[in-house]
């Protein structure tokens, strides 16, 4: 079953992607952004199977994930992108060194109680009406296990 990206959880930093997979993501991102002459933000969706990274799609725009990343890393990435798009700065003018003590988890917020007759099953159409962010110190946190066990996620680390 396909689940809409906006209705899913995200964890920063990634907790179950090895260096080889992360390097593929970085390499693909750089190649796509350069090939598209991207100025500003780009949204790229990847799928990973057996340590191979596949590209689903790339869009020259921001996504709902950008505010989450900015808040998690305490960096104004939208401001950086805006200044770059306006020609006031170049990418090299900003330091991109995301550091995080612990982990940040993005969780979708659903308002099904306000819409009792709506189909609650998740699929390709986005159904979340917002997001929340949870900061935890480590992956042994009870909230982390509660969130991911509900979704039957495979926890490798």
Q: Where are the predicted features?
A:
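ATP-dependent carboxylate activation and anion-phosphoryl transfer catalytic cores
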Residues: 3-157
């Amino acid at each position: 079953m396909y689940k809409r990206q906006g209705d899913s959880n995200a964890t920063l930093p990634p907790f179950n992607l090895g260096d080889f997979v992360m390097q593929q993501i970085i390499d693909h991102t750089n190649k796509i952004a350069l090939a598209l002459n991207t100025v500003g933000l780009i949204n790229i969706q990847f799928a990973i199977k057996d340590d191979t990274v596949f590209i689903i799609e790339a869009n020259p725009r921001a996504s709902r994930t950008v505010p989450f990343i900015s808040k998690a890393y305490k960096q104004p990435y939208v401001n950086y992108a805006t200044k770059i798009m306006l020609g006031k700065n170049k990418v090299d003018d900003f330091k991109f060194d995301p550091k995080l003590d612990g982990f940040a988890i993005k969780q979708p917020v659903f308002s099904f109680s306000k819409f009792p007759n709506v189909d609650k099953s998740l699929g390709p159409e986005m159904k979340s009406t917002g997001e929340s962010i949870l900061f935890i110190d480590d992956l042994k946190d009870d909230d982390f296990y509660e969130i991911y066990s509900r979704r039957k996620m495979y926890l490798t680390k």
